Amino acid sequence: LINGYGKAGKGDDIVIEACEFAETFLKLTPYLSVVLNIDNDHLDYYGSMGELKFAFKRFALMTQFMIFANADDKNTMDVMYTLDRRVRTFAIDNHADYRAININEYKPGFFEFDLKEWNTTDTTRIRLSVPGRHNIYNTLAMCAVCRFVGLSAEQCAEAALNFKGAGRRFEVYGECNGALVIDDYAHHPTELRATLNTAKEMGYKRLIAVHQPFTYSRTKMLFNDFV
């Protein structure tokens, strides 16, 4: 693919970012799965948070071996507690199998932390090359999965340092009349909040946000949260 949404590697495994919209993620039977959070999205389809959580439970039950879950997200853990499945957790604030401790903002908007694993007293320093506190959770999830499949903590640290971000995820387009132009695919209030907080953490003096509604139904249902 040229500027597409996939990248072909040389291994036997495939990594997919699955979406819960219209239960599309229920078409998958993953060997391992990661649940970062469960937010009030796609409720025009599901009708309630209860039905949305039930869909995530079905997805988790389709996971063949291990589920990795964010222990700081209540909705996620509400689902995990109902499962008869192997679950490993990651977190910043709560007790978990993989934790980020000694978090430091080494330059405005960019973070580093010590990776603390459940089965050792050793820690590994992880430095992120992408901005935003929310990316600590993304990196924790990566570390948890990679450690589980046999990569070293040092390899995880190297991967985190070398990862420069994905398209339309706080992507810098350039400058216009001295203003830095950044594009982000955030289309849910939680995502918008993370994007705006990242920009604020980076110390920009003036912030102008231009929001393009992604769907009419989401905008109507979550209008107050968007505001």
Regions of interest found by a model, annotated:
Residues 7-11:
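Conserved motor-coupling elements within RecA-like helicase/translocase cores
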Residues 12-21, 181-187:
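Switch II (G3) loop of P-loop NTPases
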Residues 1:
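Short beta-strand-centered segment that lines the nucleotide-binding/catalytic pocket of NTP-utilizing
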Residues 23-32:
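Short, flexible loop motifs at catalytic/binding sites
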Residues 32-181, 204-206:
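Acidic, Mg2+-coordinating active-site environments of NTP-dependent enzymes
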Residues 177-187, 213-217:
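Acidic/glycine-enriched edge-of-secondary-structure segments
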Residues 20, 40, 73, 186-188, ...:
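Short, glycine/acidic-enriched loop or turn micro-motifs at the edges of active sites
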Residues 166-168, 190-227:
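Active-site beta-alpha connecting loops in nucleotide-dependent enzymes
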